A protein has these predicted regions:
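Gly/Lys-enriched N-terminal cap/neck module of very large, oligomeric protein machines
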Residues: 4-138
Length: 140
């Protein structure tokens, strides 16, 4: 379960930390409230391709992290063991991206590649998007 996400110098966000309560989480809000930025940061932490243009203007790098509770997460533990990632009941994912198109990824302090991050990310969280479109009808 996602407990906390921290975002620094990503898109418009200088620095923000959000804590999540146990259970189902829904993000909703007005246009421009930051839902897409939050989901973009979460996507990077789960293995999405880095978009280096998302580094906040005037900064050299963005740093993102997420803390997951592994208490009820049985499927990810064997994968972490296979990848030689030490863990107890929590997993800290950190990712740094810089303007030189470099990305550094850490799982509980151990450097990993994007493929390992994607494999772990698939076991941690499900993100569902709902896109609503307004259709304009014209009478001729």
């Amino acid at each position: 379960m996602l407990e906390t996400i921290s975002i620094k110098d990503f898109a418009l966000i200088e620095e923000k930390e959000l804590d999540f309560a146990p259970g189902f989480t829904v993000l909703s809000g007005e246009t421009g409230a930051g839902k897409s930025i939050l989901l973009g940061a979460l996507g990077l932490l789960l293995g999405d391709k880095a978009d280096y243009d998302k580094i906040r203007q005037g900064q050299e790098e963005a740093e993102l992290s997420a803390l997951f509770s592994l208490h009820d997460s049985t499927s990810v533990k064997p994968l972490l063991t296979e990848l030689n990632i030490p863990f107890d009941e929590e997993l800290l994912i950190r990712r740094k991206i810089n303007r030189h198109n470099k990305s550094k990824i850490y799982l509980n302090g151990v450097t990993v590649g994007v493929q390992e991050l994607k494999a772990v990310g698939k076991e941690l969280i499900a993100v569902s998007y709902t896109h609503l479109r307004a259709h304009e009808t014209r009478e001729d």
